[in-house]
């Protein structure tokens, strides 16, 4: 098939390379001319200088994949595409767009007669080799037309053992892509995926931190009125090799996972993770997942606590902590203990 790709960052460029390797022809555009120039020399890839030229180079009915940062940039690109594409063309939004924005974008595309297909990907910088997990929402006919593209980009059935009981024809989900439903559904599923990711990351990080501090009993304890003493220091005399623990967990343990694999790589490269400040960002999906849980009235304490922990990592709780110290001083005359 022929595809237009808008956005040649790490994800967009590697998706193009995976598609080209699978026999698809790609017309590519990026706001950075150097990025287009770098890609244009690669196999089955043609670079263009504008969205209008991209539209002209593609044969109707067109398939255009938008892979730019979510938010205002995606909105601007989709609005411009609505003026350059034709009835029956397919627009794939592959970024981490808020599913509610999908519903808003749909109006722009539908008004021009195009088929809005919202796609979300998981795979990051490893996707070129591993393939990308694709959660797709939108018109069913548009999905069917673009399915050869999805099948090429996805990891394939060999990426994981088949679930017991699935012995018949291989389903798209087993290949790593799924039509989740109407417009917005794909990004909704990816939103929850990322919320789960926050929780999994937080639990793994907290567990490793408990292991790292299991030698607290060997440290000099200074008892005072402001510090609860460690009652049983003899129980905390362990100096664990954290990279080795992560390595053994990778083999046969219940928590073995790709996330643990990546953590083991990071710990091998830097056992103390000294180059990281511990200031953890969030890209929005965790917040949106928490909002959805509130709107639905369903409990999600693990996911929301993981999100709040990211906020705390940026010292956004600094004033709250000062307020706590101030209250303790006011009601009990408790002085703050200096940091070690």
Each language-model region and where it sits:
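General beta-strand structural signal in soluble alpha/beta enzymes
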Residues: 47-49, 93, 111, 115-119, ...
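Helical "substrate-binding/catalytic lid" subdomain
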Residues: 135, 145, 157-334
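Short glycine-/small-residue-rich Rossmann-like dinucleotide-binding loops
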Residues: 67-70, 96, 121, 154
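Short beta-strand "acidic-cap" motif of Rossmann-like dinucleotide-binding folds
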Residues: 26-28, 118, 297
